């Protein structure tokens, strides 16, 4: 079925929502959040795609930004609404986001596109492009690697989630084919930031709509 990977992942997040929300703070992409702030104008409107329990939305609201968050999981959204009452949250499939064109100054997609199938990603990037204003900034963080897999790990209470892995050049090509201009793109390993974390490589990508 077309949506089996999404339904399975939603079920995992709904099941472990409270435990996941407590663990997630330790995995915040601190340097990336600070850089994203420098790329936006004051009072910018940010779309947080795959906002989860509101960890990053809380940070951006505290910085004075307007934040709209979307997620597949209603249980995570319930936590986000309690945690960040000054942000707005919707349950939406980010393969078919329902907002007017050029609504946002920034799109923050941290560890969210990795739950899609590879063939779905170009369509979603095109939607991000449409939703951003001219000069708007897109941040994407995905796991580096090859292929797709269902993976159970401690962060997800050993329940299996779907992941698609990317190469740097592949992601760069996808963004440029959509029309984005790359600002900066790099990889890092979790253990380089927190020695007690996973030996896991991530790609962080900042790009801009001309």
Residue ranges and their predicted role:
Residues 153-169:
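Acceptor-substrate binding/catalytic loop of class I
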